[in-house]
């Protein structure tokens, strides 16, 4: 049985796009960032959904491009004393939870996530308290405070396996915050899942009718879909998976044309993985609607070259992530529980986020 907890639909105010830099300014900030990384004993870790020039700079300077959990784990294994996290705020918090001894900086602390914003800790706590018989599973795309309330934290690549495991133990689930991913794991597992009603502003916009028209234009194309997308879109996919899983699918699928339903930032690493293939964004407009995100997270777009340089140079309250130690310890419990479960299954945990 699956129930849906309805909360008021939210229209999140989008941040202003960064002022574009000209070629000379880009070159200036790239060199400045390289210098500051050395001066601050820092490493740049970037999410798959940041702009291509940021991902390229992370690779060029010895950092990494990955999902949120792998970003934090890379930082843990790297000797640098400072992590510059190019992503959204919960990613910086996750890095700090797993690396308390390191300084964690971000280009801006105002880079939000609609899944995080759509799951405020007080409301979520009250919801969980009203269903005390359920095991609480939260997606990685949540605040440290929400993680601290959970029994498990999960990434998209291991979500189905974990819910199947909990279902086999007879446990009923609270799932938060993404309703589409919750619906996907419920359908795959058959578990009793009560979903919080959140959504990613990017994936929520993918449209079935528009995708069908695009598929008609490219009948030989494979469709790759992130499970944060609506179920009707997921049902059209040739491959469904997390960011890392979609990149792997792009490599292994025989089709030379790919229609990709996730943030277009992933195209940088996906094209690296299969340079001989042609990639198209799945449509986010149509069916009587215009796109708001247009397949790119507006908060990810805040991680520009100028902002990264300012984060490294200024630090302080505008850029440094702090997580209360008691809260960090509480959030670490469900995170470690997930990692231990993954190790038992001999799975490599790589998920969106």
Swiss-Prot record:
Q: Which GO terms describe its molecular function?
A: 4 iron, 4 sulfur cluster binding; metal ion binding; quinolinate synthetase A activity
Q: Which residues bind [4Fe-4S] cluster?
A: 113, 200, 297
Q: Where is the protein situated, by its record's location annotation?
A: Cytoplasm
Q: Name one GO biological process term.
A: 'de novo' NAD biosynthetic process from L-aspartate
Do the record's keywords include 4Fe-4S?
A: yes
- In which pathway does this enzyme or protein participate? Cofactor biosynthesis; NAD(+) biosynthesis; quinolinate from iminoaspartate: step 1/1
Q: Which reaction does it catalyse?
A: iminosuccinate + dihydroxyacetone phosphate = quinolinate + phosphate + 2 H2O + H(+)
Cofactor dependence is on: [4Fe-4S] cluster
Sites binding iminosuccinate sit at 47, 68, 139-141, 156, 226-228, 243
Sorted UniProt keywords: 4Fe-4S, Cytoplasm, Iron, Iron-sulfur, Metal-binding, Pyridine nucleotide biosynthesis, Transferase
Cofactor: binding comment: Binds 1 [4Fe-4S] cluster per subunit.
InterPro entries linked: NadA (IPR003473), NadA_sf (IPR036094), Quinolinate_synth_A_type1 (IPR023513)
Name the NCBIfam families on file.
nadA, PRK09375.1-1, PRK09375.1-2
| Similarity comment text for this entry | Belongs to the quinolinate synthase family. Type 1 subfamily.
Identification of the protein by name: Quinolinate synthase
